[in-house]
UniProtKB/Swiss-Prot annotation:
The gene is ftsZ. It comes from Borreliella burgdorferi (strain ATCC 35210 / DSM 4680 / CIP 102532 / B31). GTP binds at G30, G31, G32, S33, N34, G117, T118, G119, E148, K152, D196. This is Cell division protein FtsZ. Keywords: Cell cycle, Cell division, Cytoplasm, GTP-binding, Nucleotide-binding, Septation. CDD domains: FtsZ_type1. InterPro entries: Cell_div_FtsZ, Cell_div_FtsZ_CS, FtsZ/CetZ, FtsZ_C, Tub_FtsZ_C, Tubulin/FtsZ-like_C, Tubulin/FtsZ_2-layer-sand-dom, Tubulin/FtsZ_GTPase_sf.
Length: 399
């Protein structure tokens, strides 16, 4: 295990006057719009939300403050009919509107469910606009469940290839992979809801590191250095319970990711979030970070966050986003932990959130890390917070 040092900082709430970074999230199509709605419902703050759709009726039901009706001339507000070429034409029709709404952003997240008409066709157009504006652009998209048919999967892959050309970083979550982390009682409705939740988690986990200000600050430049021009990214979720919880959580996060064809080995940038109970120790954090970073590039930059959730008993959750791979086809991590499949209840816990998420950044140098970190504490009782994990006592109110 590689050693590293930590420098703690004092807790401080977000202050918009000292963190001027402008983040925007745009959901394209039905899946993207649903994901944006979930983010708003979960209380993701200090982010501007936009939805863009060809289906006017669906657009009107969105709770996003900014709604873009795409392609009135092309679709008459009736949707793209599952045809990406229609979604693309609709976005191109209103490209000036898209540009106006993205203008001024430092970072844009584009979220969509790939395989349909609007999201698949419009997302690459939106990404190209953001690229032309010089905005750091991250795509967070899903691929269809297998039961949705081979045609939809083929369309999704074509759309992803188009999107990849314009985004800096692309996180692709195959919905089918969700079936490996839930139990057999999961309903179809819940499956799609959880797909939306994973999109939300990917966006707010990254955004939270930027918008939450600490005394020793992780600024936009830190995250930009990890995300800019990095291509496909890995997103993994791990869980551990009992005596070996730290090892199990860390290892399962990097060996059972919700992502195809990408492994953590050789990555040059990491975003890591760890959540444990009141008994979560510094040594466990060190153990987790050591397991996760042992296979990354020697010059890797690691931005981490850890949360204390008093409702967790003897449990640890780990989420990892990794970027900067030399190849998409990396050798799999050989060790496989026990109990690395989440139950439906555990996955619901992971999809919730947490109100205490201190974060930090490491620069790996030989066998040690030079660290700068920030701690964040949230005190808002009325809305949820922009971190991976929300307090469990709010879970019941969302179901």
């Amino acid at each position: 295990m590689k050693d590293y040092n930590m420098i703690d900082s004092h807790t401080r709430r977000f202050d918009s006057t000292t963190n001027p970074t402008i983040l925007k999230v745009i959901g394209a199509g039905g899946g993207g719009s649903n994901a944006v709605n979930r983010m708003i419902e979960y209380g993701v703050r200090d982010v501007e939300f936009i939805v863009a759709n060809t289906d006017l009726q669906a657009l009107q039901t969105s709770i996003a403050p900014i709604k873009i009706a795409l392609g009135a001339k092309v679709t008459a507000g009736l949707g793209a009919g599952g045809k990406p070429e229609i979604g693309q034409a609709a976005a191109e029709e209103d490209i000036d509107v898209i540009r106006n709404h993205l203008s001024g952003a430092d970072m844009v997240f584009i979220t969509a469910g790939m395989g349909g008409g609007t999201g698949t066709g419009a997302a690459p157009v939106i990404a190209q606009v953001a690229k032309e504006l010089g905005i750091l652009t991250v795509g967070v998209v899903t691929k269809p469940f297998k039961f949705e048919g081979p045609k939809k999967l083929r369309l999704a892959e074509q759309g992803i290839n188009n999107l990849r050309k314009s985004v800096d970083t692309l996180i692709i979550i195959p919905n089918q992979k969700l079936l490996t982390v839930v139990d057999k009682r999961t309903t179809i409705k819940d499956a799609f809801k959880r797909a939306d939740d994973v999109l939300r988690m990917g966006v707010q986990g990254i955004a939270g590191l930027i918008i939450e200000h600490g005394e020793v600050n992780i600024d936009f430049a830190d995250v930009k250095s990890i995300m800019q021009g990095q291509g496909d990214a890995l997103m993994g979720i791990g869980y551990g319970k009992g005596e070996n919880r730290a090892v199990d959580a860390a290892t399962s996060a990097i060996s059972n990711p919700l992502l195809e064809e990408v492994r953590i080995e050789g990555s040059k940038g990491l975003l890591v979030n760890v959540t444990g109970g009141d008994d979560f120790s510094l040594l466990e954090l060190e153990e987790i970070m050591g397991i996760i970073t042992v296979s990354v590039d020697d010059e890797a930059t690691v931005i981490y966050g850890h949360a204390i959730n008093s409702n967790l008993e003897d449990e640890i959750y780990v989420t990892v986003v990794a970027t900067g791979f030399a190849s998409k086809k990396q050798k799999e991590i050989s060790s496989t932990p026990e109990n690395n499949t989440l139950s439906s209840k555990e996955f619901d816990t992971l999809m919730s959130g947490n109100q205490n998420a201190p974060s930090g950044s490491y620069e790996q140098q030989d066998s040690s890390f030079a660290a700068k970190s920030k701690n964040v504490n949230y005190f808002d009782d009325d809305i949820d917070v922009p971190t991976f994990l929300r307090n469990l006592n709010k879970k019941s109110s969302d179901d």
